[in-house]
């Protein structure tokens, strides 16, 4: 069988020779172009298994995992199963976005909720996901998630010592949909009394993986996949190429390579090309630049849901200032938007969302397109959060003090002054606030039903001591007033490598790319569609598909 080995974007020009053909890199590029491969990469041609000789590899292991966020779980699983595993990490520290999260996992039908007598079923979970994802619903991927997430939860407990408990605020973000639940599906590690769970899951998995013998190569980005193509067009991954400083390292993966490189929310060009949201800020890892996506595309992988993202609202000033340094915390607006006496308005002076809905739904509300008159663009940008002094005296906003909101806010004596300074339609804003105030006095929001759903009423950040919708509604009547510009913010991009229900990468014809797997924000999975199901809705599918990948890899024989 004639085979083509491709080593993409990796080797020093003119230095590498094929073990079979003696073709230099420069010559191979010319030959590849003549045969229609263009600038895809280097073509090393000949019979047999090019690149399989021991002298052509610097390292040989069973599995290479690219990325140490959710990928660390997969590495733990494969190493524990007796498969030697290397993790390549672009950053100088391990953990990725998982280490920055609250460690919550959305796990329907989990043992803890069932032990408390709460009813749940696979059918209910899939009904909920289908209702929330609409035409993006992928039943095979959704079912794979629900079928395997609890195995991942159990393995985190058994292998990494994670002690799970039901998250007290365990409310499905769209619990009003068919199949939604108001308690039990979201789990988080028990970090101890009064301690934060941020990073606990990641730390536990990383420690266990290192103890098992996983080799972590930090500050060592993967730069290319090594593949070969059979006569029938089937692509098989043989390993990868990494860089450590100026050194190139070629790693043979006898069984598989798993892509877990995160999203592309720190790649402005990719965001502009793919996303259908105006979000251009992220609190994810600054190394999430779409590396895994691009490497997979170069070996023919298809992409899925590239227009989608995990969203939230954020104070623009916070993210403008953190852009170079990388935001390491959730925007404080996520904790502010359910408080009494805050509203969001667009440049037209109109409210455009239920401010205390779940953060992903609020983030998506920025995506409306302007179709009125001659204007085109994003209808709800620029946008502003507005509070009055009564709200400021009752709650802290933007990490400020009682009576004095944080630095994102600017003080104005009147709403008219505020509108002029912010470029908001003045008359429209005055009318909108008047209407909002009238309804708020009665505990009503006929426009967006704010505070009427279970999620809002049980929100950790809504005002205690009030009943029903009044927990989140209060009129804005007490000057001075404060305004802060707000923007949609990415928790991460959702789209990535198209995979099947075994986490195997697929090409543009729907064929399996042998020995290439993907998980997390590098895989186009979401929750089996575009939806933020609830707390832990990103980590849940990430480790579920890590579990799926590890289980499938265990069945593979070595490539020859």
Can you say where each PLM-predicted feature lies in the sequence?
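A glycine-rich dinucleotide-binding beta-alpha-beta segment and adjacent secondary-structure elements
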Residues: 430-526
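Rossmann-like flavin
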Residues: 119-179, 411-414, 418-435
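Glycine-rich loop(s) and the adjacent beta-strand/alpha-helix scaffold that form part
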Residues: 244-246, 252-321, 539-542, 548
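Conserved redox-cofactor binding core of oxidoreductases
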Residues: 147-248, 268, 316-317, 440-467
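N-terminal secretory signal peptides
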Residues: 1-27, 42
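Glycine-rich FAD pyrophosphate-binding loop
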Residues: 81-98
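An anion/pyrophosphate-binding glycine-rich loop and adjacent beta-alpha core
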Residues: 293, 302-424, 428
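N-terminal Rossmann-like FAD-binding beta1-loop-alpha1 element of flavoenzymes
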Residues: 63-86
